[in-house]
Amino acid sequence: MATYAIVKTGGKQYKVAVGDLVKVEKIEGEPGAAVELSPVLVVDGAELTTEAEALAKRSVTAELVEQTKGPKIRIHKFKNKTGYHKRQGHRQPLTVLKVTGIK
């Protein structure tokens, strides 16, 4: 069984294994920088770790690959009979991480 971890970043949880590319909410940093994420759960073969004391000793390291943006979301506000309408767009900033190790 492969080793994987559940990490929490940006208010969301992601299942990651070594070598995975993951798009997460924006993390400040330059491409090539090392990022350390705290795991919520670690599975190493048949061994499952969820206790806070044991997880404090574990860490997930990742390399920041690039800063990018998500797909465009279009917002249109409209009020009937007044001629009011407003168009707006939004692209969420994202960070692409490559998981390099689970310790």
From Swiss-Prot:
Superkingdom of source: Bacteria
Keyword rRNA-binding: yes
GO cellular component, one term: ribosome
Keywords linked to the UniProt accession: Ribonucleoprotein, Ribosomal protein, RNA-binding, rRNA-binding
SUPFAM superfamilies membership: L21p-like
InterPro entries for the chain: bL21-like, bL21-like_sf, Ribosomal_bL21, Ribosomal_bL21_CS
Pfam family, one: Ribosomal_L21p
Molecular function per GO: rRNA binding; structural constituent of ribosome
Any single GO BP term: translation
Described function: This protein binds to 23S rRNA in the presence of protein L20.
Family: Belongs to the bacterial ribosomal protein bL21 family.
SUBUNIT field: Part of the 50S ribosomal subunit. Contacts protein L20.
Protein name per Swiss-Prot or TrEMBL: Large ribosomal subunit protein bL21
Species for this entry: Nocardia farcinica (strain IFM 10152)
